[in-house]
Amino acid sequence: MILYIATPYGFCSGVKKSISLAEKVLSNEGEVYTLGALVHNPKVIEELSKKGIKILEKNGFVEGKALIVRAHGLPQRDIEFYRTLGNRVYDATCPLVKKVQILAEYLNKNKYKVVIIGEKNHPEVIGILSYTDDQGIVVENEDDIKKIENYPKIGIVFQTTQSLDNALQKVNLIMEKGKEIRIFNTICPETIERQEKAKKLSEMVDLALVLGGKNSANTRRLYITLSKKIPTYHIENIEEIDKSWFKEDNKVGIITGTSTPNDFVEEVVELLKSLYPLEIHLV
């Protein structure tokens, strides 16, 4: 069996920074809560939980504690609320997400109708929307675009894990809705790179394994890209892998979402090694 592993794999830089900050705060504070799941990967959340990092779910109430803003960010009002309760709030928002928040706030203050291309219910998008005083428009599909009125000034930003192809299609449809339109490409470069690697893998292999959380937006998009071309399996844990999927003469591809730990890749590689002799290539 020949195995092609798409690079980069494992955590993106934003996830690394968020986890590093959480562990540092835990070391200094002793007791720590994250405001929602820090990242969208159950394996990572389980490991953080074992270390003592707890999750404060939506509408949870604590006072005088150390709290960490999740990598996807939070609405401004939530952060302000927890601070009024005497909590020490540490911001682990991905720097690229923070950039989108700042841009959305800038555009809103300068009288642009802010359009966020992304998923309405994704925590990142909900957070960005708050920086427009909740006056922005979230575009998830073409029906959302049809509802947009004509505005003199429109500013467009993107959920950082959007696929570039999907985003460009929507931008083209929005162009006729405003006289002045400013577009900021806020899609994460690592997300774009992994999408391109998914396309490349689809031309090289017989089947693909997409490793990452089922609740991870960027991982789902990798799965969608690959599954259009070849048999593809979205794997969250090793128990989901069925050995009957593989044959000795297979060319198999592995690609990971941006919050998938390296050790999960290694775990899957070891499983494949136990099935057939394995020739490994990085692509």
Swiss-Prot record:
Disulfide bond positions: none
InterPro entries (UniProt xref): LytB/IspH
Which of this chain's residues are annotated to bind dimethylallyl diphosphate? 40, 72, 122, 216, 218, 259
Key word Cytoplasm present = no
**Catalytic residues per the record?**
124
What the entry lists under PANTHER family is as follows:
4-HYDROXY-3-METHYLBUT-2-ENYL DIPHOSPHATE REDUCTASE
Please give one Gene Ontology molecular function term for this protein: 4 iron, 4 sulfur cluster binding
Domain of life where this protein originates = Bacteria
Lineage, top ranks: Bacteria, Pseudomonadati, Dictyoglomota, Dictyoglomia, Dictyoglomales
Enzyme Commission number(s) from the entry: 1.17.7.4
Q: Which cofactor does it need?
A: [4Fe-4S] cluster
Q: EC top class, in one word?
A: oxidoreductase
Reactions catalysed according to its record: isopentenyl diphosphate + 2 oxidized [2Fe-2S]-[ferredoxin] + H2O = (2E)-4-hydroxy-3-methylbut-2-enyl diphosphate + 2 reduced [2Fe-2S]-[ferredoxin] + 2 H(+); dimethylallyl diphosphate + 2 oxidized [2Fe-2S]-[ferredoxin] + H2O = (2E)-4-hydroxy-3-methylbut-2-enyl diphosphate + 2 reduced [2Fe-2S]-[ferredoxin] + 2 H(+)
Cofactor stoichiometry and binding remark: Binds 1 [4Fe-4S] cluster per subunit.
| Keyword annotations | 4Fe-4S, Iron, Iron-sulfur, Isoprene biosynthesis, Metal-binding, Oxidoreductase
Q: Which biological process terms from the Gene Ontology are attached to this UniProt entry?
A: dimethylallyl diphosphate biosynthetic process; isopentenyl diphosphate biosynthetic process, methylerythritol 4-phosphate pathway; terpenoid biosynthetic process
Protein's recorded name: 4-hydroxy-3-methylbut-2-enyl diphosphate reductase
| Gene3D superfamilies assigned | 3.40.50.11270, 4-hydroxy-3-methylbut-2-enyl diphosphate reductase, catalytic domain (3.40.1010.20)
Presence of the UniProt keyword DNA-binding in the record: no
